[in-house]
Amino acid sequence: MRFSDTPGQEGLKDSLRRLADNDTVPHAILLSGAEGTGKMMLARAFAQYLHCRRPVGGEPCGECPDCRMHAELSHPDLHFVYPIVKREKEKIATSADILPLWQQMLVEHPEMPSEQWLEIINAGNSQPSIYVNEADSIVQADSYPPFTSPRKIFIIWRPERMQTAAANKLLKVIEEPMQGTVFILVSDNELQLLPTIYSRTQRFHVGSIENAELTEWLIHKRGLGEDEARRIASIAGGNLINASRLASHSGETEEFRLQYMEIMRQAYKKGAAALKKIADRLGDSKGGYGREKLRRFLLYMGRMARENYLYNLGVGSLVAMTREEEEFASRFAPFIHSGNVEELVKETDRARIDIERNANAKLVLFDFFILLIILIHKKRG
């Protein structure tokens, strides 16, 4: 993993490089920020940079034995710690017991969406945790000298999921580890960390990614055209996970545009019966969109509400729509205004969240479509 694999965050990347280059790496670093900011990718890049034998231009060389082991997720001095669901019958007690699943996650979903991890480990209704057994394993692993590198690195993903007993057991080793040991904590919510753990780290906030930086990443790393990359970056809202998901389904834009137009036309005509049919079709458990595709479609609808409002205001420089989307906006945008845009966006987000939580898709969509009828006929504020 290279620093350039993560879009944006240039100031943070420079700070991490300086720590390594000046040999001032602290015992424990905390990278914290919202999900989708590329924190784990940065942690992995920093770990590889620390292990690399001949870094070039502020990046790991990618060719030395240490870099090759990082690429294969097999470096003996890189340890990953992550929340698991303990299962005694399957003899699952620590991270190492499901290492192949973790490696699958890193390869297939390097942006680290938490919901994907729950699916991979088949968590069901259980909440993954970092247990006290894990702390025992960390303390033991820290007692051994590094194998091939001057540094031994522990990357702890979602340390806020650590049980109190585990956190207490790790306090001493995080504060006074063996020489050469570095802990990198990667947290979605630093406020949930045990204060005694939090206070022992050097902290770096990882913010959302600028649209221009996401656009460049989508062009150069995902092979999208400039227009499509710009649209996806606008929809993603600075979130790398959203951008990656949308890029994987970039061919859906035209399908979503046509479906959006039909829904809004029927809402304008107060066609409740037609909207009921659309809700039943899209929400059907067998032939419909499915939960993930519905999620992406509702993200698209939310963006269209915002874009049509901006178009209505006459600020074309801020609008990120295709020619076909603008053509529809030229006729429909007057119905999205200051009197309803906030509620439109809020209700679109509410429908998306309900579907993410496995609510009945047909009912959620139909309720949402009926609200659309009310909202687009609402007078300006």
Predicted regions and their residues:
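Residues immediately C-terminal
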Residues: 161, 176, 192
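Clamp-loader machinery-focused feature within the broader ASCE/P-loop NTPase space
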Residues: 2-165
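Charged, glycine-rich active-site and insertion segments that engage polyanionic ligands
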Residues: 1-49, 55-57, 65, 179-182, ...
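Conserved catalytic/switch belt of AAA+ P-loop NTPases
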Residues: 143, 168-182
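Short, structurally constrained coil/turn elements
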Residues: 72-74, 177, 197
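Conserved adenine-binding aromatic site and its adjacent loop/helix in ATP-hydrolyzing domains
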Residues: 140, 172, 199
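Structural recognition of the conserved hydrophobic beta-strand(s) that form the central parallel beta-sheet
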Residues: 153-157, 170, 181-187
